[in-house]
Regions:
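Small/flexible residues
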Residues: 11, 42-43, 60, 70
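Basic, Lys/Arg-enriched C-terminal extension of HTH/homeodomain DNA-binding domains
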Residues: 51-72
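Helix-turn-helix DNA-binding segment
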Residues: 2-41
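Residues within the DNA-recognition helix of helix-turn-helix
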Residues: 14, 45-48
């Protein structure tokens, strides 16, 4: 339970935006266009998301984020 609370506090608003895009199956280029950021910045956010959620890939990150209530 404490881990869940900690994760909620450490995932940024922008990382949640990226997670929502990942949930919809968008590529890094599509996410960059949608959010008005560079593909490199998207990759940076994804790396942070994977680290924070202790996920091995994008799909697992989305599943974990949904389980933790970070995204719907």
């Amino acid at each position: 339970m404490i881990e869940h609370e900690c994760t909620k506090k450490t995932v940024s608003k922008r990382e949640k935006d990226v997670l929502c895009c990942l949930r919809e199956g968008r590529s890094s280029l599509e996410i960059a266009d949608d959010l008005g950021i560079t593909p490199r910045t998207v990759k940076f956010h994804i790396c942070n998301i994977l680290r924070k959620l202790e996920a091995n890939n994008r799909t697992q990150a989305v599943v974990l984020a949904m389980e933790k209530g970070l995204i719907e």
